[in-house]
């Protein structure tokens, strides 16, 4: 927001070390407009986020970061302005940053009065400036206090018509340099005899496949061994199942991206988690890794338990 050149200050003044290596974003706005949602979206895309920082501590934090280059390349500070005293603090802090040559941007989140009232009522919480009066009185007071800050913000996002996923996507688009959302998938094999994985988003049951356990030569081996993998995938045509399953997961994964979901676990289960589920999981992970904007890891939860 600022490109001011710092002046030599007297002893005890705020004089950060240059050059500044970190990107500083100040997130503020109306209560109920989505500051926490914005903070979560930024954190998911590599920002170090400090929430509910008292405005008077902003310069101290910025100075600390400036003195440790590359420690926090992207720092977002969520400032909660409650009352005229705090507004004076943030105004003074931002002026100090500007005078000291520290560049920053301000993201201001706003929403209509009716939307803010509805959100507070849904959360069954009072507005922080409401006191003993009406909620609309508190909103009006906050809007008056923040008017100048809103006018000087680098980016103003009106969240009136946005749900949490849409807001997160908009913030990500504005302040993320990492490109399209990459979905991190974990393909996990498991044995039903040991229970379902509690963190699985999807579960595939491959107990319909012939069990290598009943083949004496294969019983001591696992689904990581080539002979077991060939038995499961080739001799019994599990490849067709994997092909259809990947095809079915395609629109699901795309929907996850639209909803700003970054992680998903796909579990594949057989009886003991040793043969069939392991072989199928390895092949499934290979196929999923070929999809765009996807990274895949495998985990064999119950391998070695028998």
UniProtKB/Swiss-Prot annotation:
An example Pfam family from this entry, by short name, is PapZ_C
Family statement drawn from the similarity comment of this UniProt entry: Belongs to the RapZ-like family.
Q: Name one GO molecular function term.
A: ATP binding
Species the sequence originates in: Renibacterium salmoninarum (strain ATCC 33209 / DSM 20767 / JCM 11484 / NBRC 15589 / NCIMB 2235)
Entry keyword set: ATP-binding, GTP-binding, Nucleotide-binding
List ligand-binding residues for ATP.
Answer: 29-36
Q: Which cysteines are joined by disulfide bonds?
A: none
UniProt protein name: Nucleotide-binding protein RSal33209_2275
Q: Which InterPro entries match?
A: P-loop_NTPase, RapZ-like, RapZ-like_N, RapZ_C
Describe the function of this protein.
Displays ATPase and GTPase activities.
Q: What residue stretch is flagged as signal peptide?
A: none
């Amino acid at each position: 927001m600022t490109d001011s050149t710092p002046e030599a200050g007297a002893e005890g003044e705020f004089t950060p070390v240059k050059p500044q290596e970190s990107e500083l974003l100040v997130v503020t706005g109306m209560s109920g407009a989505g500051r926490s949602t914005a903070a979560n979206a930024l954190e998911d895309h590599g920002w170090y986020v400090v929430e509910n920082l008292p405005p008077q501590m902003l310069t101290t934090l910025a100075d600390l970061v400036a003195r440790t280059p590359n420690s926090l390349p992207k720092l977002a500070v969520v400032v909660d302005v409650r009352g005229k005293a705090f507004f004076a603090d943030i105004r003074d802090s931002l002026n100090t940053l500007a005078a000291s040559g520290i560049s920053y941007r301000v993201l201001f989140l706003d929403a209509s009065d009716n939307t803010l009232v509805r959100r507070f009522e849904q959360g069954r919480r009072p507005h922080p400036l409401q006191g003993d009066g009406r909620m609309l009185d508190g909103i009006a007071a906050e809007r008056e206090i923040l008017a100048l800050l809103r006018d000087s913000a680098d980016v103003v996002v009106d969240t009136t018509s946005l749900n949490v996923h849409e807001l997160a996507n908009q913030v990500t688009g504005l302040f993320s340099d990492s490109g399209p959302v990459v979905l991190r998938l974990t393909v996990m094999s498991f044995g039903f005899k040991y229970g379902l994985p509690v963190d699985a988003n999807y579960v595939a049951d491959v107990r319909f496949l012939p069990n290598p356990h009943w083949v004496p030569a294969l019983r001591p081996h696992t689904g990581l061994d080539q002979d077991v993998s060939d038995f499961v995938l080739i001799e019994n045509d599990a490849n067709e199942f994997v092909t259809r399953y990947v095809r079915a997961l395609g629109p699901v994964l795309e929907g996850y991206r639209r909803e700003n979901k970054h992680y998903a676990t796909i579990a594949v289960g057989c009886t003991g988690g040793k043969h069939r589920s392991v072989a199928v999981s390895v092949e499934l992970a290979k196929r999923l890794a070929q999809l765009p904007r996807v990274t895949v890891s495998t985990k064999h939860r119950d391998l070695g338990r028998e």
